[in-house]
Amino acid sequence: MYTHKAADAVSWYQPHADSSLALIRQTGITADAAVIDVGGGASTLVDDLLAARHSDLTVLDISAAALDVARHRLGDAASAVHWLEADITQVEFPEHRFTLWHDRAVFHFLTDAADRARYLKAVGRAVKPGGFVIVGTFAEDGPEQCSGLPVRRYSADTLHDEFGAQFELLGKAEENHHTPFGTVQKFLYCYCRKLG
């Protein structure tokens, strides 16, 4: 995608991930807490987390080109981030590696139950007990496709049900995302804590 379009010309572009940042602040995590941004690619969330002095950041994306956009934008500051080109359904993290798992717009692309199960296994393994998971997907009245691909739309209850009893739902947020093309995409964010 990023080899054909500028980072600010894709439907999911945001100058700042304000909804995500507000939820991250609500967690009260410290600046040295381990944070992963799943599907972070060219997102500016990492810029804002670095500006807030977060020091243990991982950005995972399946697209090397998207990661390169962010690295180039950050310049020397990119060396403070762990960049991981991987498919989230295929990667295995060390146990309890992260205090915060953030995903805006990856989980809704997992239309296959087996892919969702692998994703959820990765979350369950990688997030510390007491850690937080913030996941943003298209809402029930959001788009049925993104970039020509089908997606699953969620309510807070159906999204939390995917994650199961090991995660306590702390809250939800809705976002009307205005795309660069002048359309509105309705997002739902769930904010959970891992029990145990």
Positions of PLM-derived features:
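Short catalytic micro-motifs in class I SAM-dependent methyltransferases
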Residues: 105-109
